[in-house]
Amino acid sequence: MNPVTGSAAEVSRLADSPIEWRRAVGLTAETAVERGAALWQAAVTSVQAGELDDRTLYWQRLEQIFGLSERDARGFERSSRNYDPVFDADAQYRVLVTGFDPFHLDEAIEQSNPSGVIALQHDGRHAAER
């Protein structure tokens, strides 16, 4: 059963049981970190292609974290916010840019987060030394 396309009754039943929700969407401890990283990378690809909006990352993070155990949620959080980057060991300077911050989302749902977009735009890029 796909919880996104299932009947209202089925979705309601799954919403009452996080364990059932996890089974329905196929989310396990092993896939939580992978899905978080894939979610981040999809947002990077979208923004670097010119879609200057980070709200998809925000909403998908909220949807996918539902039903995770605390331990699994920590791994998902770290990977979906890009907290675990790989640094070049030879780099003289390292800057960690992470993403996700609701940025007035409650007051203006149509507004994306400029700092989130900037984090996504610069992911994986190297700055030249001056």
Residue ranges and their predicted role:
Residues 1-130:
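N-terminal catalytic or cofactor-binding beta/alpha core of small enzyme domains
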